[in-house]
Amino acid sequence: MRVWCDFTASAHPLVFRPLVELMQARSDTVEITARDYAQTLQLIEQHGMTATTIGHHGGRSRAGKARQLFSRLSGLRRWARGRGFDVALAHGSHELTITARRLGIPSATTFDYEWAWLQHQLGCRAATKVVVPDSIPIERLARYGTAPPKLLQYPGLKEEYYLSDFEPDAAVLDGWEIDPGRTLVVLRPPPDVSLYHRHANPLFPQTLQHLGRLESVHAIVLPRTEEQRDYVRSLALPSVIVPDEAVDAQSLIALSDLVVSAGGTMNREAAALGVPVYTTYGGRLGGVDEELIRQGRLRPLTDPRALELTKRAGGTAQRVRRDPAELLALLLSARDA
């Protein structure tokens, strides 16, 4: 079987790493395309995969995003035509499902946040199968032309599948002088925005300023873009550490005492690894985060002073591990639809 996967954001190599390994182990041919955005290309390489780079992020303007969308669609179509793919898979890449449909290739897309309206209008309608967590109410997806049998759902978090074989590597901390007596906090900024932009959610910068001045804390910030990296460094906060490049974020999370993130994936990785986690997300919560909050595995943050900055005892005893082969089977069902 010939399979095409498309990665457009940093989380996608993580999600697909075990799926690609499973397919390659049974002698399937897997080819990957990727958008040059954030740490996507670095993470592909770090996880032992190779990809053809097509396109880059269009920036914050609608015009820039539109130009890059059409440019990337054209590039993907030229690349994929004639390669004889049996199925195409993606995590939220509407470029893949649109291109696959035009080329007559069955496709499946998966995602775990249902309020990205334009992305899902494009991606879901073009896909053969749509695979989402069962914590997302089915009725929320009807607006995207998605319902059973096109819609398939899986239990738990996607992170519980791709982290099923994960064990943390303590060496991730070796590059910094970490005082084990201080509370180790990992922070992830909001996606695709300037932290200092006047329309940005002020809560994350406020949290960063608060933690960055506490002598009892090590605050490791994992920026999404070089712009964010430069801005955080310019603040010169004494307790803040900013890695120079992409790091083993999962190990960092597992070894931390606390995670504060404005983005969904790192929040859910922390929940899957049994680490206390706060969200500063200012948008509409999706079904996955709503369920995690009900379970007490995710806490909304409205004031940085409310953070419980304590050393964590234990490890990852609360972890849930799920079989990635089950997620892969749902995605590959597009081939037989």
Model-derived regions, located:
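Catalytic donor nucleotide-activated moiety binding site of glycosyltransferases and closely related
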Residues: 47-60, 208-243
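Leloir-type glycosyltransferase catalytic cores
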Residues: 147-178, 295-337
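N-terminal subdomain of nucleotide-sugar transferases
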Residues: 1-33
